[in-house]
Regions:
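Short beta-strand and beta-hairpin "edge-sheet" elements
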Residues: 24, 66-96, 195, 329-361
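Beta-strand-rich assembly/attachment modules of structural machines
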Residues: 1-123, 127
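Acidic, small/polar-enriched beta strand-loop surface segments
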Residues: 2-7, 211-351, 368
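Charged- and aromatic-enriched interaction segments used to assemble
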Residues: 90, 96-239
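Short intrinsically disordered coil segments
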Residues: 57-62, 109-114, 225-231, 265-267, ...
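Solvent-exposed, acidic/flexible segments
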Residues: 74, 114-119, 172-180, 240-243, ...
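A mature extracytoplasmic/lumenal domain signature
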Residues: 47, 97-99, 198, 254, ...
Length: 368
């Protein structure tokens, strides 16, 4: 059985942290690793330990305490404590992964970008944030360092064009108040993928935001998921007709003919089916186009699987795969007669103290 421990530190806002407890007595811990999302950690602690103090100060302080889950010396995940809640005899702890720190964080300057690289601009959001006093988490960047040059505010303009006028991408203190939203918008535009990684480096933990362009992870021919070997139950393979569409229209901000919009379609060999996506947060043609393309790809109508429960097994030991990886799944054929398909790991939910890990997956060709 893997040996787990839970470590608490105090983030100092200058890129460092002070460790305050190396063996928190947590109950019901769950570690969440996510592709293109914050991830994090949830747990509870018995009431008799909920008021732990170090040097007279409480251990559990929102937006100050970080908690990490370590398995046999390897950090499997962690996050920043945001919302401790007393629930009867226990204190519930909710820790958001480091990418979630940008949520609700504002841009304090003024910047207008006509042509640029979305990945580089996303890094600028972190650099801008961490340059502020008390906002530095010590996040570093690894992996891809660039994506593609484009007119970020108007992706309908070809990158090779020299337009007379183009709508710029704006960052400013009066309207840019959620940098996590901006970061994810840039990830969708490029597109790029990312995940957060924590690892020991001597006596400190380094925090690395890993980028992949256009994707992160690899097709792992050395690993496999097989029902009856390391997959506990036959996964539910669905072919939902209500999600199928051959024509997608996205309607964003505005009214009537002035609405931001984009249409995408594909010939499928089946009857044509429409889907209308309304989202008033979409304000540019580039956003509408990216959303329509993503919706169309996800609505091909081919059989899909979304969840797997896997156990520790030589075929795929915990830690041998990461979010973003693609792994072959072999299952028993159901009414769809799907037995072998490649799935991409979008999320890993680890329950320390058990040998069972829950994976959020999608059919690889639907998300790449």
């Amino acid at each position: 059985m893997t040996e787990w421990r839970f470590i608490a530190s105090r983030l100092d806002g200058t890129g460092g942290e002070d460790f305050i407890d190396f063996d928190l007595p947590l109950d019901e811990p769950e570690v969440h690793q996510v592709l293109n999302g914050p991830g994090g950690l949830t747990a509870s602690i018995p009431h008799e330990h909920a008021h732990l103090r170090v040097d007279g100060a409480p251990v559990f302080v929102p937006w100050s305490t970080a908690i990490y889950a370590e398995a046999s010396g390897v950090i499997r995940g962690g996050g920043i404590l945001t919302d401790p809640v007393e629930e009867g005899p226990k204190l519930s702890l909710d820790c958001v992964g480091f990418p979630g720190y940008l949520g609700g964080t504002r841009y304090t300057g003024i910047r207008s970008i006509e042509r640029g690289d979305p990945l580089k601009v996303s890094r600028h959001l972190w650099e801008h944030t961490q340059a502020r006093k008390s906002f530095d988490l010590g996040v570093e960047f690894v992996g891809a360092s660039s994506s593609r040059e484009m007119f970020i505010g108007d992706d309908d303009v070809p990158p090779s064009a020299t337009p007379q006028k183009v709508d710029p991408y704006e960052l400013n203190y009066w309207s840019t108040h959620d940098l996590a939203k901006e970061f994810d918008h840039l990830a969708e535009l490029a597109p790029f993928e990312y995940r957060m990684e924590h690892a020991w480096d001597g006596d400190r933990i380094r925090h690395r935001l890993r980028y992949g362009y256009p994707t992160l992870g690899a097709r792992r021919t050395d690993l496999r998921f097989v029902v009856g070997e390391n997959v506990l139950e036959i996964p539910k393979i669905e072919m939902p007709g209500e999600e199928y569409a051959s024509h997608v229209i996205v309607l964003g901000a505005g009214e009537g003919r002035s609405m931001t919009r984009d249409e995408q379609s594909v010939t499928t060999g089946r009857l044509g089916r429409d889907v209308v996506v309304s989202d008033k947060t979409i304000t540019t043609p580039a956003q509408a186009k990216a959303r329509a393309q993503a919706e169309l790809k996800a609505r091909t109508g081919t059989p899909d699987v979304t969840d797997l429960q896997v156990i520790q097994h030589p075929n795929a030991v915990l830690g041998s795969y990461q979010v973003g990886d693609e792994i072959a799944l072999t299952t028993a054929g159901g009414w769809t007669d799907e037995r072998d398909l490649w799935v991409k790991i979008l999320g890993i939910q680890i329950t320390p103290g058990t040998d069972v890990t829950t994976l959020q997956v999608r059919r690889a060709e639907k998300v790449n």
